[in-house]
């Protein structure tokens, strides 16, 4: 989860988020090198007389500044496309969870079970217990098995919402009349917090998401107790 004054990303807990962090570092290095080169050229122009105001044609230079940006864009596009295909590919999910956005709460349905569904509301600040987080705790957590591929179907009952859990690299729009899907797999157990990431009305800030990733045996006990 995020902490006050945090400047970087949350710790990655899924393969997709790890890939996104690597891509961020890769792209940031390219941006840093380009910015350094531009600042160096500007400083040379301001501090030396190495300027060519009368030059009308320089095919070599034009060739360089045409080919070099194209190469840089390819270096950014290829890993980006790879991650996009990884995020869209869902092969043989072990579990499917349907998520519906409402004003202003989430409802969940485990479609592999006959009657396992519930609503998830934010716990008001006045009812929080010591150690719980303001605006992030819910009355019903989404319990899921770790180290298993899980398909999440996302839609909405009313307006646009967005189901997002940053540490898992998840952000899927909830659109009325449309069913979007994403996949998640956690590499370790724990509580993972998220929030609605699409402005959806006056209580948009009060739609937290809490995923509780547990070993498979614990998930089976929980699901049996909910049926």
From Swiss-Prot:
GO CC terms in record: mitochondrial inner membrane; respiratory chain complex IV
Cofactor binding remark: Binds a dinuclear copper A center per subunit.
Gene Ontology MF annotations: copper ion binding; cytochrome-c oxidase activity
Chain positions recorded as Cu cation A1 binding sites: 161, 196, 200, 207
Membrane disposition: Multi-pass membrane protein
Top-level taxon in the UniProt lineage: Eukaryota
Cofactor: Cu cation
Binding of Mg(2+), residues: 198
Keyword annotations of the record: Copper, Electron transport, Magnesium, Membrane, Metal-binding, Mitochondrion, Mitochondrion inner membrane, Respiratory chain, Translocase, Transmembrane, Transmembrane helix, Transport
Mitochondrial intermembrane side: 1-14, 88-227
Subcellular location: Mitochondrion inner membrane
Task performed by this protein: Component of the cytochrome c oxidase, the last enzyme in the mitochondrial electron transport chain which drives oxidative phosphorylation. The respiratory chain contains 3 multisubunit complexes succinate dehydrogenase (complex II, CII), ubiquinol-cytochrome c oxidoreductase (cytochrome b-c1 complex, complex III, CIII) and cytochrome c oxidase (complex IV, CIV), that cooperate to transfer electrons derived from NADH and succinate to molecular oxygen, creating an electrochemical gradient over the inner membrane that drives transmembrane transport and the ATP synthase.
Protein name: Cytochrome c oxidase subunit 2
Organism: Tragelaphus imberbis (Lesser kudu)
The encoding gene: MT-CO2
